[in-house]
A protein has these predicted regions:
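Intrinsically disordered, low-complexity basic tails and flexible linkers associated
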Residues: 1-86
Length: 86
């Protein structure tokens, strides 16, 4: 799978994530998919940082929340990815 293919399925990933864990969805719904290399998906939050005001969701994106996103990606796409942030 390449980044373009993953982007085409991203709304399905987010919909599944929202149905399972609304906190995880809030933490990731405004992420930008920056790159996909091997099994590593890099997410960028520049827009989220500009618009979040006093809310800092970075601390919310802990191992459990990140794992929920990784699980949703695997279920929708069939591939296992590690999530990193820039």
């Amino acid at each position: 799978m390449n980044l373009v293919e993953l982007k085409s399925k991203w709304n399905d990933v987010l919909d599944l994530l929202e149905s399972r864990d609304r906190i995880a969805w809030i933490a990731y719904f405004d992420a930008r998919l920056a790159s996909l290399s091997d099994d590593v998906l890099t997410l960028h939050f520049v827009d989220a940082e500009k618009l979040s005001g006093a809310h800092d969701y970075k601390a919310t994106r802990n191992d459990r929340i990140r794992g929920a996103l990784e699980d949703a990606i695997k279920e929708v796409t069939g591939i296992s990815l590690k999530i990193v942030e820039i």
